[in-house]
Amino acid sequence: MKREKVTSLNGEIHIPGDKSISHRSVMFGALAEGTTTVKNFLPGADCLSTIACFRKMGVSIEQNGSDVTIYGKGIDALCEPDSLLDVGNSGTTIRLMLGILAGRPFHSTVAGDESIAKRPMKRVTEPLKQMGAAIDGRADGGFTPLSVRGGQLKGIDYVSPVASAQIKSAVLLAGLQAEGTTTVTEPHKSRDHTERMLNAFGAELAETETSASVTGGQKLRGADIFVPGDISSAAFFLAAGAVVPGSRIVLKNVGLNPTRTGMIDVLKQMGASLEVIPSEADSAEPYGDLVIETSALKAAEIGGEIIPRLIDEIPIIALLATQAEGTTVIKDAAELKVKETNRIDTVVSELRKIGADIEPTEDGMKIHGKKTLAGGADVSSHGDHRIGMMLGVASCLTEEPIDIRDTEAIHVSYPTFFEHLDQLAKKA
């Protein structure tokens, strides 16, 4: 896809529904008793994989664009799938679903695409095995395909080596089916969509700053869920609005969950002109409008506790840093190596192709700004949606057009991304 520089970006867009919350709304609706309705669901490939997997386990789900209805009959109504549960490209689907399958008295096999086959699963399968699930696969359950025989689980106190909402959620979902209480403790607080949604579906949890506990045997009740816009998708337009000259972009109804707003903190730290207008609506997840305008940016050091709050935004932050005065350092982000691609390598290689002064480090990267991006190169998403969208924003800045390969990857989380970008763009 050939893309060229724009003179400015102006207008208002509605960001598609949050991917993390969309996944969970379907899963919890499938486990609940009664009907669950979901508004502003994200109909991207990843979330559609979640729907397909639960349909295979006998759950009746109607999906019409961004409206979804799940006719739940309780967790005990899930039935043994008669074929492979295929998660496609979705790490959230496989890791959370493993927590559910761990407590079900049947056999299932779970796998996904080539990217999923490379992603580490032991971080989830190990605590589930400790609880009593039988899980096997390549490298002793470390990689897909995975075979799961669920059964009687016992609650555990699990100390996670990394702050990961996927690990925490998998163990808590298993804990709902276990005897006794299950507690997960993390080094820093990860995103808390699971805890908020369990509350919305009627479950009781005990929480501290870095831990969450559930007691087994609780029943979930169907709920009405509004999914706010995905801040990880909004991040691309926040960055674009900050660095493309003469821009002003309004993003409507974006999720403002404090465990996800690291991008907003970084933009403010870098000196961006950003206004946050919280919604007054009563909702399990806070949300509001964001207004971003072009401004001069300065470099920042990004690391420590903020990393779990912006791990998915690091590719676009790297691009942002090319347009900031000084050297930006991103550290404590080794988790990037086990995303859809090794995002340290792919961000560095693709941004270098278009003229960025960027170098990889063991746990992040250093970006030297402010730099004019020459462009005039062939670049690729490497099958990673967030790299594809980062390059889409980069094309607005490059002196010469760039040709972006493998743009279909963006359908995972933001099928209308380029449509929205073109809607805002004033061409040179």
Swiss-Prot record:
An annotated GO cellular component: cytoplasm
Keyword set, alphabetical order: Amino-acid biosynthesis, Aromatic amino acid biosynthesis, Cytoplasm, Transferase
Chain positions recorded as 3-phosphoshikimate binding sites: K19, S20, R24, S164, Q166, D312, K339
Chain positions recorded as phosphoenolpyruvate binding sites: K19, G91, R119, Q166, R343, R386
Keyword Cell membrane: no
Superkingdom in the source lineage: Bacteria
Top-level enzyme category: transferase
A molecular-function term among this protein's GO annotations: 3-phosphoshikimate 1-carboxyvinyltransferase activity
Recorded metabolic or biological pathway in which this protein acts: Metabolic intermediate biosynthesis; chorismate biosynthesis; chorismate from D-erythrose 4-phosphate and phosphoenolpyruvate: step 6/7
GO biological process, one term: aromatic amino acid family biosynthetic process
Residues at the active site: D312 (proton acceptor)
Catalyzed reaction equations: 3-phosphoshikimate + phosphoenolpyruvate = 5-O-(1-carboxyvinyl)-3-phosphoshikimate + phosphate
Compartments reported by the entry: Cytoplasm
EC number, as in UniProt: 2.5.1.19
Pfam family, one: EPSP_synthase
Keyword match Transferase: yes
Record family assignment: Belongs to the EPSP synthase family.
Self-association state and partner proteins as the record states: Monomer.
Function: Catalyzes the transfer of the enolpyruvyl moiety of phosphoenolpyruvate (PEP) to the 5-hydroxyl of shikimate-3-phosphate (S3P) to produce enolpyruvyl shikimate-3-phosphate and inorganic phosphate.
Name under which the protein is recorded: 3-phosphoshikimate 1-carboxyvinyltransferase
Organism: Bacillus velezensis (strain DSM 23117 / BGSC 10A6 / LMG 26770 / FZB42) (Bacillus amyloliquefaciens subsp. plantarum)
